[in-house]
């Protein structure tokens, strides 16, 4: 069995893979702070926009490399953050339930990135808690 990284290197240009991993790392590194600050009404608007952009970019880049689990997870997170950023109510904040869920998503994405970089054969299984998408996304 061939590892994920080796498989990507065979199917895609090496520069493309390196760019993907570099950008994925940079975007993922900023997620936790952006997510936690969704609880602050002064940061909510800018952070929900930035999170939406990051999840969109991860999704798009992962589609190109046919990394389906990453595409699916980032697409769900993009949809949720799309709902967040479209709420223009003054003083609105994200619910604790949503913040906890987004932190799980960020951990899962970091795990996927680690799996690729460590040349694992498969991407890890999805944390089952992620399946329970929060009903209440606003506080």
PLM feature spans:
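Non-catalytic helical tethers at domain boundaries
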Residues: 1-139
């Amino acid at each position: 069995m061939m590892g994920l990284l080796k498989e990507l290197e065979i199917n895609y240009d090496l520069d493309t893979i390196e760019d993907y991993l570099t950008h994925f790392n940079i975007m993922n590194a900023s997620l936790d702070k952006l997510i936690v600050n969704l609880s602050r009404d002064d940061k909510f608007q800018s952070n929900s926009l930035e999170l939406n952009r990051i999840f969109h970019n991860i999704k798009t880049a992962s589609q190109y490399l046919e990394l389906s689990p990453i595409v699916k997870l980032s697409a769900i997170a993009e949809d949720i953050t799309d709902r967040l950023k479209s709420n223009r109510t003054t003083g609105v904040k994200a619910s604790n339930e949503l913040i906890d869920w987004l932190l799980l998503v960020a951990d899962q994405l970091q795990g996927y990135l680690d799996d690729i970089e460590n040349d694992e054969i498969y991407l890890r299984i999805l944390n089952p808690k992620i399946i329970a998408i929060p009903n209440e996304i606003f506080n």
